[in-house]
């Protein structure tokens, strides 16, 4: 068959299997270079060098067969990446090298030795882990991934990057970076203003290491950073201030004694006065212990000018702390303390974040996929959740950025610029003000719901909540990985953990009560036995509550999906409650709603398809013909662990928790858990599904009344009388697949628009993916939805005779917000014994190999029928009838109408909303001349230039004084006008593209030729 160019993106080439190999002689040369670098350049001891050489040798064969799968694809760069990854793994997992004194090596040393930056390192490291996972497990044990702490360190880097920018912005607003008026008649050398900046960052880093856990949450770290700002305000010379303490709106909290500094900072940075006061106290203690400074008995008497018009209550002044003659010494002492305290076992030197020019930082973002940071720009397909997105503004939604007349971006203390840090602080304020004051026990109304069940379930529910939350919020989750310190870090972690546990418990009871109230209105009765006695439902609710608390504080050591493992549920289980949880908590901040929407996308795109997902336990009932493949791949979920097993595993004390009256009933909600496709049940249609938003992709006529919530979690194996006798599993799987189809539609539209494909091609791609969902569901098993979409686009391009290569598709995909390189670099396959390549068992291949060896053999009949323009043949209809829950495959619908991104309020003072234009609309509305006045994300007005630089160019053009020819037209163009324009364009291009397609259109394989 004819071939086409292999995909590539951003300069990297993705080739088929067997490409990019080098000979054995090249491998030997690599070993020599690696050994020489370990000994001469890095000076590693014999133990570390021996371990590194062992890992390098055992993974060398994988490296030689994957020479184009990392970085730009050049052998030299791939060798540098691979060597760096090997050394990092040895430094984290090896038996020695826990510190510099043991001959260890830090991540910074590794990066500098191989001329890499931190952004590229973390982007490429997951690919290394996928390929070398079996080798690492053999050398270091099955828990190597947990001990490597790669995700935690990456999230920590993201936090530090955000905090450093937050600190720089705050410092520049409060102080001068350059001393324009140095003091006269000073015998000592003038202290540079930048030295004060460095002092603040170093003091913060020492505070994090000595007082907080090594991987502390973002909110606690921000409190510590604000406490450092308070110390700087009190001690930095007045001449370096950028504000007038009496007149600045940033210090609005005043009393007869002057400005209340702590209260003013709390208002400005959305911190808690109690937490900030504690952080300031810890900072002062460090100054006494490390810098050996003594606090003045009366702060106001020690320094009149710096504390003038400031209420000294709660503040401490240290004489000579930041005086010019002692600043240099203070910096040296902090540097020494930091170097002595930092754990060098693969760690970063966090001082580099104060230097924007540091080559190790690199450029780009690490937040996508690794850690969800609210407040960042959201692209269309992230905003348009496959579930019914509920993103209405809430009272706690943060204010928007406002351009200040002074040019510093601050309208007032209440109009700080929106950043991920400020958004996290605002969301934490919601927890503090709305959830924390609630009682930690069920309310009277909720207790009445519990007692109205066939058996009072109060003790069961409170016991379960105590055990599950105890498993999530344990010291082992947050406090065990800390730096050696003489201070009481464990005690601080225990207090913090208990506070977060209480917040999750209160949120759980609050939302549960709201759900029960809504259910009684639907059922016209108070008996909610089926819902309130369901074990899986409660665990999902507790997990959702805990996840929101963890997401609010931006914890590093308990990032999603950690809550799933702790609670014993799967991603498919959690997906059932997300929409309902959001609907029943009216005060939930917008950013937390977005967080849940993004989680649902992750669940649908890949996590629900992973091995061990409970989705397969329902699918094996709904589609009996898939049972052989599900069992062959071993995809079924294990039984949900009992509460007693969870308590024993996490050493949770049951003292104070009510006993479980009937131990056998603990498993009753899951007693019909699917292990065989021949059982039966009485579940009604899923209440979490809005009938207007989700319909089964294979039965669009289901329009039943919204059923009660308690029907969502019953066993999937009995007939459902509300749906014409179909099994509950069939209804549930239909709902799930409809969400998959909607998510696919969103992703397909975004990528097809970027590739500038016609509407007809877009609809063909969507129709093909729909057919795969219905008839070839097994293609999704253990894979990512984007892998199927990428292959579908290329397949449709081939039958449509478009000059579109896989290389161009991947290049466009890499610009999408949801892109992860692993999607096209590593696709799961399970070779059957009859495979033509002779391989057997599990493997991960590039997307071209998957397309040629798996996708095309499976989907070729569908592609041929799609190219011929005919409906599925009789054989396929009969196959769908056997596989699916419905008697026949319906006619595929046209591409669904999808909403644009929700409009956002951009002004705190005026009701001004902005709804971003999609690429297709923007290209239609803007002429070539007018496009130069707009800066678009992902597209520059000039080659090789970022949108941020575009803004400067645009401002310069607008302020140049040149007359604009013609009159500006500010008329609002409706979506209808745009749609008509696009429809005309698409119709014309589609007609031209598909005019010559016949039933004999060949389905071509993709070959790795350039």
From Swiss-Prot:
Residues 419-861 are annotated as: Pocket. It comes from the Eukaryota. SUPFAM superfamilies: Cyclin-like. GO terms for molecular function: RNA polymerase II transcription regulatory region sequence-specific DNA binding. This is Retinoblastoma-related protein 1. GO terms for biological process: cell differentiation; negative regulation of G1/S transition of mitotic cell cycle; regulation of transcription by RNA polymerase II. Keywords: Cell cycle, Nucleus, Repressor, Transcription, Transcription regulation. InterPro entries: Cyclin-like_sf (IPR036915), RB_A (IPR002720), RB_B (IPR002719), RB_C (IPR015030), RB_fam (IPR028309), RB_N (IPR024599). Residues 1-23, 657-679, 868-898 are annotated as: Disordered. Regulator of biological processes that recruits a histone deacetylase to control gene transcription. May play a role in the entry into mitosis, negatively regulating the cell proliferation. Formation of stable complexes with geminiviridae replication-associated proteins may create a cellular environment which favors viral DNA replication. Residues 731-861 are annotated as: Domain B. It is found in: Nucleus.
